[in-house]
Amino acid sequence: MVKKVLEDASYQVQLKNPSEVQTPEQIDLEIVALDNLMLRIQNRRAEFCRARNQSALISSCLPAELIAEIFLFALAMSPSQVPSSSVATTLPLVLGQVCSAWRNLAWELSELWDTFHCRISKGRCPAQARLLSEWLLRSHERPLSIRLSFLDDEFHWNDLGAPIDIVNVLNRHRHRWLALDLVLAPSWYEPLRMETTLDTLISLSLRPTASAFSAQRMDMFLLAHQLREISLSHHYLRNVHLNWDNLIKISFSTASVDEAVELIRRCNNLVTCILDELYPFEDEYALPLTPFSHRRIEVFHIGCRVNLDTEIFIILNCLALPSLRNLSIMLPEQVGNPLQTIGELITRSECPIQKLRIHGHTLLEQDMIDFLQSVKSLKSIEN
């Protein structure tokens, strides 16, 4: 094969034996000539390799619609799509690096760009904001599911002078927000306050940087009339302003006992209620003198901080939940048997409960058997 290439007219060269060369100058000329020949052969080889690779590309073998489905499946399976993952979404950019055909397809496939997790660095925030702007343009006009978190230690963002470039970019597309999951720097609250309706936003998750309690007024989502699900932590309920009757699912961590009861009272259409890391009673809201009924809650989870087991019982004693099907309670190990309080809630509610989970406190096997026999609708107890 090499002999054939060397004999080709485009590679004509007269190869000499070393014995035919007499002087050092002639030897140097021969070496240069051979170097040039090898370079030309390498270049030609690279051309043939590119041609071979191009012909073997998936983009030349499959229709664009099928390749697009493969891209979307790869994105759905990527680690960045796992909730609470620390991995940023980079797959669309990686696909664009393979070849121009893949890049052209990926850049036009808006579904690749409408759901993402962006990890922000304080030092690179302006540059990341420009890249985010380009990213969002590629999503065309699709509804956006956005998650933002920080590469830096969150304490570095916990001041009013933190960059707001990213928020300014997001605000230009607020009419397309479908789901937002944000860690809020103190400087971000004010830019988010814009008097425009958020007609597409249905899911919202917010917590302050460094999990430090925020006293800032949170009214920037009051015009989100389609909001159905919200997750909050380290905010005071008195500062949170939402269309409470629209909510069907809420997760609130670090609420005080009276905030938790008030929250349930406000959300008349709540179906799923998750209350984690309860704090002691803060006397912000008065507890009801008698239990009140919430007729829609079907799934109820409640968990307390260490040594605050009585707070859970206080909340349960305030409620009647006639639609309750699934109850989950997280308790410290040293707490007394909670089954009596739970039984009173079930009796008072006359609910069709089917599943009970009690974690943190170990129940006696006979107690669980007796409880299952006494509550006819109950199908399982997990402990």
Model-predicted regions and their roles:
Residues 1-383:
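Leucine-rich repeat
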